[in-house]
């Protein structure tokens, strides 16, 4: 299932009695913000909407995404421009400060924070490190092998990997049930893009994120509202995303605040894994399935 379809499906389903986010299995899960999943849908609107109604909300005006029920072409154009620019980046580093609302069964909202560090060298090197109060995970890809290390329990798994980041992301999700944070970033502008209908797109106006001047846009889709802050100037980078789930009365939010480095310094060692002392190697579920199939 594509990332956008997965997000929309999860967001529009009725809340369970526990009302907490669906987590993938055991210590290898990688739930983080699906930043680019939201943006893929917006870019798709430009292609599938033949008639567009112009609605703008500049500073000092009220931006009501729900009541407007229209699409601002400026907002769509901004995301289209951003997506094209992101596809030109060959290497980059991102620090993502994440906040996530968890809604407990009694309706109480508990907010969690995490930090995700990314280092990418296209087409075949990737390093992702996730740190929070209850987890510290490292994902490494060197073009040949994919390794996941759970630092707090000192477990790791290493499996053969395909030759590109895009293929790795698909394999990790489909075969090993591992969803890498911000994985849509690496599918941008490819055949794996999602196209979905957006009910409202609004240009809210200029705003600053961590001292960086951005343009603030708001979007509405059934079950989900989200906002994106895109850096102004020659580097149209996404700087912040806020996603609000509308199917829960508590309206829980997920936010990503991104700091970019477009000229990172690194060597091949950044993507290699040297098991620490006493580290225990474990077998992924996908590996077990392969072994069973070969044994038949």
Where are these regions (language model features)?
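Bacterial N-terminal signal peptides
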Residues: 33-48
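N-terminal secretory signal peptides that target proteins for export/translocation
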Residues: 1-30
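Gly/Pro-enriched, hydrophobic low-complexity segments
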Residues: 55, 73, 97, 132, ...
């Amino acid at each position: 299932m594509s990332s956008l379809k997965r997000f929309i499906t999860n967001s529009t389903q009725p809340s369970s009695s526990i009302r907490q986010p669906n987590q993938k299995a055991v210590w290898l899960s990688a739930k983080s913000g699906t930043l680019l999943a939201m943006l893929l849908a917006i870019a798709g609107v430009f292609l599938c909407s033949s008639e567009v109604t112009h609605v703008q909300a500049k500073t000092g005006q009220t931006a009501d995404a729900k009541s407007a029920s229209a699409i601002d072409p400026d907002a769509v154009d901004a995301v289209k421009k951003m997506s094209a620019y992101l596809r030109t980046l060959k290497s980059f580093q991102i620090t993502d400060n994440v906040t996530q609302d968890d809604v407990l069964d009694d309706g109480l909202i508990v907010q969690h924070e995490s930090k995700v560090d990314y280092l990418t060298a296209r087409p075949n090197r990737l390093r992702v490190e996730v740190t929070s109060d209850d987890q510290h995970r490292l994902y490494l890809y060197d073009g040949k092998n994919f390794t996941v290390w759970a630092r707090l329990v000192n477990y790791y798994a290493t499996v053969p990997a395909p030759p590109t980041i895009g293929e790795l992301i698909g394999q990790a999700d489909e075969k090993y049930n591992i969803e890498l944070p911000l994985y849509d970033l690496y599918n941008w502008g490819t055949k794996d893009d999602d196209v979905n209908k957006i009910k409202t797109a609004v240009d809210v106006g200029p705003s600053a994120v961590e001292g960086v001047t951005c343009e603030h846009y708001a979007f509405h889709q059934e079950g989900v509202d989200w906002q994106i802050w895109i850096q102004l100037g020659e580097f149209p980078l996404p700087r912040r995303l806020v996603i609000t789930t509308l199917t829960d009365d508590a309206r829980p939010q997920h936010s990503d605040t991104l700091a970019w480095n477009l000229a990172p310094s690194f060597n091949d060692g950044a993507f290699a894994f040297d098991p620490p002392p006493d580290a225990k190697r474990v077998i992924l579920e996908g590996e077990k399935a392969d072994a069973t199939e070969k044994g038949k």
